[in-house]
Amino acid sequence: MSKTYATLGELKPGNFIMIDGEPCKIVEMSKAKTGKHGSAKAHVVAISLISGAKKTFVAPVDTRVEVPIIEKRVGQVLAITGDSVQLMDMETYDTFEVPLPEEEELKSRLEPGVEVEYWVMPPGVYKIMRVRGGK
């Protein structure tokens, strides 16, 4: 999957960053100038988009970090089998399976024929983010 690079000082809350090989959304960020001869440091608190775990990262603000390029796509639910959902992409008509979301509210709204927004994230992870339309 694709990713790009940015300096840590350019990022702000709401941006995405790769921490420990997982795409994360920055929820809190603070910058502190250290000593007379030290460089400024950035303290980043982020939530993993894959596992939902809270991750922290401290580095100089001029550090180059990986920024994931997340594709937001639309698909239709074809079937729900056990702990996976079969989706069809609404543009390419490709069919594939993604894990069933862990959020109860989202899981309860999934049924065959419903359109969903799913994200394709590095390293090739698919995740259903929300149900589209009013059901």
UniProtKB/Swiss-Prot annotation:
Acetylation is among the record's keywords: no
Predominant location: cytoplasm
A molecular function GO annotation: RNA binding
Swiss-Prot/TrEMBL keywords: Cytoplasm, Hypusine, Initiation factor, Protein biosynthesis
Subcellular location per the Swiss-Prot or TrEMBL entry: Cytoplasm
Matching NCBIfam families: eIF_5A, PRK03999.1
Family: Belongs to the eIF-5A family.
Protein's UniProt name: Translation initiation factor 5A
CC annotations in GO: cytoplasm
Domain of life: Archaea
Keyword Aminoacyl-tRNA synthetase among record annotations: no
InterPro entries: IF5A-like (IPR001884), IF5A-like_N (IPR048670), NA-bd_OB-fold (IPR012340), Rib_uL2_dom2 (IPR014722), Trans_elong_IF5A_hypusine_site (IPR019769), Transl_elong_IF5A_arc (IPR022847), Transl_elong_IF5A_C (IPR020189), Translation_prot_SH3-like_sf (IPR008991)
Annotated positions of the Hypusine modification: K36
GO annotation terms (biological process): positive regulation of translational elongation; positive regulation of translational termination
Organism encoding this protein: Ignicoccus hospitalis (strain KIN4/I / DSM 18386 / JCM 14125)
Its biological purpose: Functions by promoting the formation of the first peptide bond.
